Every structure is written in C-alpha cells, then in structure tokens.
Amino acid sequence: MPFIDLQTNLPASLFTDDFLTRFCSAAAAALGKPENRMNLVVSPGLRMLIAGSSSPCVMVAVSAISVTDTAEKNKEHSAKIFEFLTKELNLSDDRIVIQFHELQPHQVGKKGTVMSFL
C-alpha cells in the first residue's frame, strides 16, 4: 500500500485527473504494486526552493511496505519515477527530488486495524 506525496510549485492546471491516473500507473509499475493499492496526493502551487532556486520543481515522498528498504531497489524506483516526471512535467532531473520511506505493516492503518493483521 504505497503512499506517494508530490509537492510542487507548478500550477494546478498541469495536474489533471488524467495526469494523476498516469502517474499512479507509472508509480505502481515502478514499485511493482497493483494500481488499486496506490495512494497519491498532489499539492501544486506551493512556494518552494530546491538547491536555492524557486524555478519549477517537484519534491516526491514515497512511503511503502517492503519495497523501499534497500538502496538498490530505491535506485530502480528513482530512475522510473524520474523518467515519468521529467517527460510529463518538462523538468530537468536536477529540479526533482525524491525521498523514500520504508514503512512497517504496523505503521499503516486500514479497515479499522493495521496491515499487520490484514
């Protein structure tokens, strides 16, 4: 059950329902998870800096159980997510940063319990 949180200073008009669907699909494929398990939030129009510049940029946080637990896995995930975002948003790769957070099953609640019991 991955969680993707994309924050950006790009305008909301770029983030259509179609973009969200395509990003969800790309992120699911990158992480090897089914699309119906993905959770995605896009927060556009923020005041942001990356590397001291307020030029168009994106920060992404990826939190997931058992798929973000090694540098090797995250390197692969990063490459696929960067490929999608650079093409879709016309950004250079130095204007995108990704944070990976490993979650444990007891840290994710669903259906009135936690994933440890589902």
Positions of predicted regions on the chain:
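Interaction-mediating elements
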Residues: 1-118
